[in-house]
Amino acid sequence: MKYVVIFKAKIKTLDEQYFQTAQLLREKALSQFNCQKFEAISEQDFEIALSYWNSLADIQAWHHDAEHQVAQQLGKEQWYQSFSVEICKIERHYAHSVHSI
């Protein structure tokens, strides 16, 4: 993974359409657009999502996908008060895991 896209949003209202769309698009990004991993968390009225990618070309292709564009518009009109997107290059990665025997 070379890049991470950081999506941060202040939530207005999330309805059933949001949850269905989010699940569909997550699966589509992972299966059709070379997204390597996706993580998201919400707390009160704040949401943050991290998606990991190998290339800027894959990120751009995903951004321009027709279904993703519709969801972006719905986000602006219905689901979010505000949001921001940051695309960052991953220079290093560290991890630790404790395994039970």
Give residue ranges: language-model regions.
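Low-complexity, intrinsically disordered Gly/Pro/Thr-rich segments
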Residues: 71-73
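Short S/T/G/P-rich N-terminal loop/turn motif that feeds into the first structured element of a domain
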Residues: 1-47, 56-64, 81-101
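Arginine/glycine-rich "motif VI" loop of SF2 helicases in the C-terminal RecA-like domain
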Residues: 75-80
